[in-house]
Amino acid sequence: MYRLRRPIDFLPLFQDQKRLFTAGERFHYNNAGYILLGLVIEQLTKQPFADYVTNELFARAQMTQSGYFRLDSLPADTAIGHIENEDGTWRTNHYALPIIGGSDGGAFLTASDMERFWRSLLTHQLLSESMTAQLFHPHVKVNDVASYGYGVWLKQLDASHEKWHIMGYDPGVSFHSAYYPQSETIVTVLSNTSDGAYALVQAIEQLLLEKGIHT
């Protein structure tokens, strides 16, 4: 596990596996695609993926508390991920994750930094206006209410409200961050448990809809 430090280190986990279907036939989210994307970025920029994201995303968006930190070199105020055991006790997730995140996820960040990310992205400080539009374009329909853009989930909440969101989880950590374009509202929930973020996001979203904050 601790030998997984660069995108190339993840290749043996999937490179010899049989494809699920022909490319373009249907949609199936998979982390392996983001590992390959990280390798492309490294090839084009001649930089380690984590360094490129730090310089071109975190720094430009002024996400000063975020980074690809090693599990054995975390900032002092980092919330440690926890996994619940079958008997109801808890253990840390230090032996359940790679030593450092990869191009499929694993960065450390704060809710305030995620707001800076959304604002920077939506004001075209990170990408051009046309590229940003492609990011949020529904390139594939997932079900009756959800589509997928370029790395972003697009969900229709009701006839007049939608949200653009990113999410993820690993052992001992869960994350959900959404932008509601009708009101320009941002909601970010981070949890140091595997499923702690989802229920809270649902509750906040329901409250927003009931109170009419989106309108």
Protein language model features and the residues they cover:
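Short, gly/Ser/Thr-rich active-site loops of penicillin-recognizing serine hydrolases
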Residues: A159-H161, S194-T215
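Short, intrinsically disordered/low-complexity patches at protein termini
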Residues: S73-D77, T188-V189, Y198, E210-I213
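Short, surface-exposed loop or secondary-structure junction motifs
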Residues: M1-Y169
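Short, small/polar residue-rich loop motifs at catalytic or cofactor-binding pockets
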Residues: G172-V173
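Short, well-ordered beta-strand elements
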Residues: H176-Y179, S183-T193
